[in-house]
């Protein structure tokens, strides 16, 4: 499928699975009859034993929509303001835009607010790797990512260039891979993914730019009244449901539960990121720059990770332990200081010094790494019409590559939850959106993401310790589970 097909295709939810991508398949008739016989015999015997257990429905992928939850349509569904709540999405990053797309496909009314004045107003991060969220992209109507790159090999080196670990499809199969293997990670820049999602909405005009959230007030039976600052003036807007998708320093979260309850937690290291066009290397070549290899180099303290960023550039991520004060100071000194520190620490095997030197300071950023304590669902129970997704709900370190993946899964899960909980005749307006949708959604989201937050925090210690130097063809994260640090 070409990019144009992604843009022009309209989608609506699959009538077979109601947009879930899976169906409950009834147990076979023989199994049901057996249960009926067993339960009659049990009741007749009048014993104190354990009663027979009814066979549960078997959940299967929906074949009608290839498990995406969507089917092609001549047009998007008509917005259903009668049955669905109007959703105010705060934050136009990946999670917020993904939620807007999922609402569009379901006829759920929404408005997407972003504090930035434009799409390119500030850096939206560098590259990311779609892991389990690759399948979720189908559920957002994106069947292919034109700017996505597929890696087939992952290599870990010592600073001298000795390979201590290697894994991936190329390693396993020892054959030349297809251009788009079915089961592999997809590397893409954050802005490219964000743009692909925005194109589903029709482009930049789908976002209310320049809207800085100042506060909100939940009103009994009247939803939520939000206050924004727009071009220096105050603006009041009403919504039935507010979703904070505004990142690790979420204004919605701060207003909802306060900054002191679950403050930012420093994880003891700094990350420096850069993008290097291959043409800047002026003819220097390396087999590690073949566009399908991800590699990292470690020494037990510093660690650099490099992956394809585009067909003609690579992204690198350098990290090392540092006090919070030192990390803040270095970050505030700006790109040139970050580059100098990075170059000083990475006089290692080729092509690392060459790439570091060839990366323009304008393409470098760096920041201390934070997360937060796992969110207790009880902190949200009194928020009748407000919830959080993505980094606003469960921020994590970047070392497991799960932040964007979890945000995409959150967005799709919430839209599906609204479709189910606010369906016609559900009487959600009487029960409230929390009881009808949010409590179940938040429980699933926080349970799913908890291990990702925990593993991402533990990876900080693992990847910057001597245990990472142990040889073995496995991901570095697995060593944390199977070996003592």
Predicted feature locations:
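Phosphate-coordination loops involved in phosphoryl transfer and adenosine-cofactor binding
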Residues: 84-86, 210
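C-terminal helical "tail/cap" subdomain of flavin- and related membrane-associated enzymes
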Residues: 2-11, 15, 22-34, 38-66, ...
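Conserved mid-domain beta->alpha element of the FAD-binding
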Residues: 89-109, 113, 243-244, 345, ...
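Short, solvent-exposed loop/turn segments at secondary-structure boundaries
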Residues: 122-126, 328-331, 399-403
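Active-site-adjacent segment of FAD-dependent monooxygenases/related oxidoreductases
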Residues: 39-44, 116-200, 463, 477
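Conserved FAD-binding catalytic core of PHBH/FMO-like flavoproteins
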Residues: 162-163, 183-184, 188, 194-360
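Short, well-ordered alpha-helix to beta-strand connector turns
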Residues: 84, 107, 151-152, 204-205, ...
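Conserved Rossmann-like nucleotide-cofactor binding loop
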Residues: 95, 118, 249
């Amino acid at each position: 499928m070409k990019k144009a097909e992604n843009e022009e295709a309209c989608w609506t939810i699959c009538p077979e699975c109601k947009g879930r991508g899976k169906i409950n398949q009834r147990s076979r008739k023989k199994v049901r009859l057996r249960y009926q016989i067993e339960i009659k015999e049990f009741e007749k015997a009048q014993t104190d034993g354990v009663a027979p257990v009814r066979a549960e429905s078997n959940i299967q992928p929906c074949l009608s929509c290839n498990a995406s939850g969507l089917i092609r349509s001549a047009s998007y569904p008509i917005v259903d303001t009668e049955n669905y709540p109007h959703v105010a999405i705060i934050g136009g990053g990946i999670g917020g835009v993904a939620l807007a797309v999922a609402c569009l496909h379901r006829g759920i009314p929404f408005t997407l607010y972003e504090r930035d004045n434009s799409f390119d107003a500030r850096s939206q991060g560098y590259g990311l790797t779609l892991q389990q969220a690759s399948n979720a992209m189908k559920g957002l109507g994106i069947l292919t990512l034109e700017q996505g790159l597929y890696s087939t090999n992952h290599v870990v080196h010592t600073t001298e260039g000795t390979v201590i670990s290697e894994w991936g499809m190329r390693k396993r199969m020892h054959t030349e891979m297809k251009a788009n293997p079915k089961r592999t990670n997809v590397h893409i820049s954050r802005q490219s993914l964000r743009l692909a999602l925005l194109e589903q909405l029709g482009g930049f005009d789908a976002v209310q730019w320049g809207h800085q959230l100042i506060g909100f007030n939940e009103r009994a039976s009247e939803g939520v009244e939000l206050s924004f600052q727009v071009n220096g003036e105050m603006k009041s807007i009403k919504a039935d449901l507010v979703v904070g998708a505004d990142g690790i320093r979420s204004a919605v979260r701060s207003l909802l539960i306060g900054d002191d309850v679950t403050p930012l937690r420093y994880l003891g290291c700094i990350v420096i990121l850069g993008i290097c066009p291959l043409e800047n290397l002026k003819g220097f070549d390396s087999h590690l720059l073949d566009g399908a290899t991800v590699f990292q180099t470690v020494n037990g303290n510093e660690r650099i990770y490099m992956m394809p960023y585009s067909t003609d550039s690579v992204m690198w991520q350098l990290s090392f332990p540092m006090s919070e004060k030192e990390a803040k100071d270095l970050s505030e000194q700006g790109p040139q200081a970050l580059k100098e520190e990075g170059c000083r620490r990475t006089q290692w095997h080729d092509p690392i010094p060459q790439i570091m030197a060839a990366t323009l300071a304008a393409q470098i950023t760096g920041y201390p790494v934070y997360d937060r304590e796992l969110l207790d669902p009880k902190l949200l129970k009194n928020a009748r019409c407000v919830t959080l997704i993505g980094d606003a709900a469960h921020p994590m370190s970047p070392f497991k590559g799960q932040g964007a993946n979890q945000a995409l899964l959150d967005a799709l899960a919430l839209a599906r939850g609204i479709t189910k909980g606010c369906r016609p005749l559900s009487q959600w307006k009487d029960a409230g959106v929390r009881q009808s949708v949010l409590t179940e959604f938040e429980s699933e989201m926080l349970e799913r993401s908890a291990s990702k937050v925990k593993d991402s925090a533990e990876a900080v210690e693992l990847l910057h310790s001597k245990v990472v130097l142990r040889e073995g063809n496995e991901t570095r994260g697995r060593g944390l589970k199977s070996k003592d640090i």
